[in-house]
Amino acid sequence: MAQQVQSEIRYLTPPSVDVKKKKYCRFKKSGIKYIDYKDPEFLKKFLNEQGKILPRRITGTSLKFQRRIAQAVKRARHLALLPFVTDMMK
């Protein structure tokens, strides 16, 4: 009976950890210096479905360009190019 109990013991295998690709700042890579607030289609890439600005850890942008994105989105909202709040933006 002791052998039967030992054979039923199952060891947990460690979860497979997928190596994620390193996030990079697309602005530094492509050499973009100015983020145009008059281009709402480009700015929508950095917004979620509710119209909120996506954080850096998701988009992978650097701090410098994240601030510029936030400023451009806020300017576009004031000019009514982007909505402040929405249900299904994308």
UniProtKB/Swiss-Prot annotation:
Family listed: Belongs to the bacterial ribosomal protein bS18 family.
A Pfam family this chain is assigned to: Ribosomal_S18
| One GO term (biological process) | translation
Q: Which gene encodes it?
A: rpsR
Provide a GO CC annotation, any one.
cytosolic small ribosomal subunit
GO function terms (MF aspect): small ribosomal subunit rRNA binding; structural constituent of ribosome
Species, as recorded:
Bacteroides fragilis (strain ATCC 25285 / DSM 2151 / CCUG 4856 / JCM 11019 / LMG 10263 / NCTC 9343 / Onslow / VPI 2553 / EN-2)
Question: Keyword Nucleotide-binding, does the record have it?
Answer: no
Q: What is this protein called?
A: Small ribosomal subunit protein bS18
Report the domain of life of the source organism. Bacteria
Keywords noted in UniProt: Ribonucleoprotein, Ribosomal protein, RNA-binding, rRNA-binding
| InterPro entries registered for this protein in UniProt | Ribosomal_bS18, Ribosomal_bS18_CS, Ribosomal_bS18_sf
Q: Answer whether the UniProt record assigns the keyword Ribosomal protein to this protein.
A: yes
